[in-house]
């Protein structure tokens, strides 16, 4: 009996030590988010297409042709010293000296619907919300925060091609803002076109085309909801497009199944009386809405938020375990956070079926390789890519 007890205690002790010493537990995604660190705290998997993270302001790249120098501190969308969150967008650069992206921003709200982000000096001037760092959790593959203004808990995780949200609203009706005009390093006219189609009461599809660092960058999406939409609407908030077609005879800003324009901002209202969280899954594709739908189904169908979070955390643990070191906690945190930051970009740029849009604008099929983007080769050839040559399993 004594042998069994000792063996049981040894196993428990070993498992506790193993859990406490997972290398991913040393990663702090908030490191580098202050000043000019140009990192973000949100959820992603190693080299995934999705980098789902909070953006804390909307400073434009230029105003009337004049560069706004403050924008440089927002290369990754998040600035630690800010006290409000504009929303959660699905693409981010990490550690770069220039920026773009911030595609497909979502923000949960309650009460009066506002279709502008407002200003950070007054969070009530738009759909943004204040927050505190004590209510924020950032781990590899997971991010959560409490949005104070509307008392909403927001949680994020990700697969390679899908950003997964879980929002807990107060009892009543909950709103979800989807801003296709938002962007990082944004400016008037950067969004060339955007569209939104309500496929049914739990599914949206659409696209956003931008003219930024990447010229004519096409981002297609499919968005699913765990609750049916009660009502919805939207309008152009960017440069106004000219439309003289038949649909102008209808009110396209309320419960209209298709919307399009240079910079759409839309809202969707849900019944949250039961306190059950609203889960939102946003799949991206550079190819088509059909590609986004396939990414959505193949990567997330049948899996709960918690299961997808666990899968993301396991992917990070495997990736980071390629190098094992020993040291005190500060050294371990510094090392594994740095290693974590090397594994965000380059990022995946192809669908689950292996199709991708090339720089020629055409659709290609991969053959025995994985297609990536965001290489930043003028900086990374010196150290990052030699590191990949050492630690890559391929």
What spans do the regions from the language model cover?
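Bacterial Sec-dependent N-terminal signal peptides
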Residues: 1-21
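Accessory carbohydrate-recognition regions in carbohydrate-active enzymes
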Residues: 21-394
């Amino acid at each position: 009996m004594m042998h069994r007890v000792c063996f049981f205690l040894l196993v428990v002790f070993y498992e506790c030590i193993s859990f406490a010493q997972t290398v991913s537990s040393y990663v702090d995604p908030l490191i580098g988010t202050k000043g000019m660190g140009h990192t973000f705290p949100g959820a992603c998997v190693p080299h995934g297409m999705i980098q789902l993270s909070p953006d804390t302001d909307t400073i434009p790249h230029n105003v009337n042709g004049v560069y706004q120098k403050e924008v440089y501190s927002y290369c990754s969308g998040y600035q630690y010293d800010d006290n409000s969150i504009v929303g959660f967008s699905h693409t981010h650069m990490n550690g770069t000296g220039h920026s773009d992206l911030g595609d497909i921003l979502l923000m949960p709200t309650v009460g009066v619907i506002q279709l502008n982000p407002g200003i950070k000096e007054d969070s009530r001037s738009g759909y943004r919300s204040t927050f505190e760092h004590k209510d924020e959790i950032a781990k590899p593959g997971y991010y959560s925060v409490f949005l104070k203004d509307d008392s909403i808990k927001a949680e994020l995780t990700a697969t390679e091609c899908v950003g997964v949200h879980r929002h807990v609203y107060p009892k009543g009706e909950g709103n979800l803002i989807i801003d296709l005009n938002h962007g990082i390093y944004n400016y008037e006219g950067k969004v060339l076109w955007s569209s939104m189609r309500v496929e049914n009461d739990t599914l949206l599809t659409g696209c956003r085309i931008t003219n930024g660092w990447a010229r004519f960058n096409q981002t297609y999406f499919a968005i699913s909801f765990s609750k049916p939409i009660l009502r919805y609407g939207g309008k152009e908030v960017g440069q106004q497009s000219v439309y003289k077609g038949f649909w102008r005879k209808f009110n396209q800003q309320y419960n209209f199944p298709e919307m399009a324009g240079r910079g759409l901002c839309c809202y969707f209202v849900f019944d949250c009386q039961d306190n059950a969280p609203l889960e939102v899954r946003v799949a991206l594709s550079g190819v088509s809405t059909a590609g986004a739908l396939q990414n959505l189904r193949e990567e997330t169908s049948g899996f709960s938020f918690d299961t997808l979070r666990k899968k993301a955390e396991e992917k990070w643990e495997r990736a980071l375990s390629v190098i094992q070191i020993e040291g005190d906690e500060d050294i371990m945190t510094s090392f594994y956070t740095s290693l974590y930051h090397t594994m965000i970009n380059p990022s995946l740029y192809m669908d689950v079926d292996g199709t991708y849009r090339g720089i020629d604008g055409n659709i290609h099929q991969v053959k025995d390789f994985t297609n990536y983007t965001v290489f930043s080769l003028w900086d990374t050839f010196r150290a990052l890519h030699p590191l990949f040559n050492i630690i890559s399993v391929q």
